[in-house]
From Swiss-Prot:
Any Pfam family the entry gives: ABC_tran
Gene3D superfamilies registered for this protein in UniProt: P-loop containing nucleotide triphosphate hydrolases (3.40.50.300)
Entry binding sites for ATP: 34-41
Database matches in InterPro entries: AAA+_ATPase, ABC_transporter-like_ATP-bd, ABC_transporter-like_CS, ABC_transporter_ATP-bind, P-loop_NTPase
Signal peptide range: none
SMART domains in the cross-refs: AAA
Protein name per UniProt: Uncharacterized ABC transporter ATP-binding protein HI_0354
Molecular function GO terms recorded: ATP binding; ATP hydrolysis activity
Length: 240
């Protein structure tokens, strides 16, 4: 679906990562961890086709007609718009809002448990509710690859667990690249996990792949996940 070949990124003369190679496959969750400032969020921006001020070398190759949606860490809902109009934002912005798009948006809000609030402005929502609306808007775009940048990091533990399960259920037929700082989140949701490393470690840009066993979303009490979590923490500790 997407191939990243020999990709390097530098800002103001400082190399964040170099010679990165990664292939994203259909219908798969891949998680990417790493220390702050190593370029994880910028990598998502590059995949989304958003310009960056850094110096980029290498290639990102897409299969024909691959559609991509990006859910950034920073809130992107418009507080003065209703929830349903935030979900159908593309139609609103480009003058294509219709009964059909509104009904589809309401259907997606029902899937994320927000149907009763469709008429409210987003300014009245809690953090967890906003993430549900953002997820519905992502689904509205009907894409193949979803880029998630720390989507649950601002939520309390219970809401985070609920939203993880909901996202996995609703995105089960999509490819997902998840940037997260939470090893447990990666282990619950992903088929493959990597740590992105800076060149200062004198290692390859990506760690060896970690492959959790069993079907996601997983229960964290599994003994093998505890071992993999320790492996991830050791890898991340080497990045500090």
């Amino acid at each position: 679906m997407v191939r990243i070949q020999d990709l390097s990124l530098a800002f103001n003369g400082q190399t964040l990562f170099e010679h990165l190679n990664l292939t994203l496959l259909p219908n798969e969750w891949v998680s990417l961890l790493g220390s702050s400032g190593v370029g994880k969020s910028t990598l998502l921006r590059l995949l989304a086709g958003i310009e960056t001020q850094g110096m980029v070398q290498g290639k990102i190759l897409f299969e024909p007609k691959v559609r991509i949606a990006w859910l950034p860490q920073k809130e992107t809902l418009y507080p003065w718009l209703s929830i349903v109009d935030n979900v159908q934002l593309q139609a609103v912005l480009f003058g294509r809002k219709s009964v059909k798009t509104t009904e589809k948006a309401k259907m997606l809000l029902e899937k994320v448990g927000m149907a009763a609030h469709w008429h409210k402005p987003c300014s009245q929502l809690s953090g967890g509710q906003k993430q549900r609306v953002a997820l519905a808007r992502t689904l509205m775009q009907e894409v193949d690859l979803i880029l998630l940048d720390e989507p649950f990091s601002a939520l309390d533990a219970i809401s985070r667990h609920q939203l993880q399960d909901l996202a996995f259920e609703l995105l089960e037929d999509k490819s997902v690249l998840l940037v997260t700082h939470d090893p447990q989140e990666a282990l619950r949701l992903s088929q493959r996990i990597f740590v992105l490393r800076s060149p200062e470690t004198h290692q390859t840009a990506l760690s060896a792949v970690i492959l959790p066993e069993g079907n996601a979303p997983r229960e964290l009490h599994q003994a093998n996940l505890w071992t993999l979590q320790q492996q991830l923490l050791q890898e991340l500790g080497g990045e500090q």
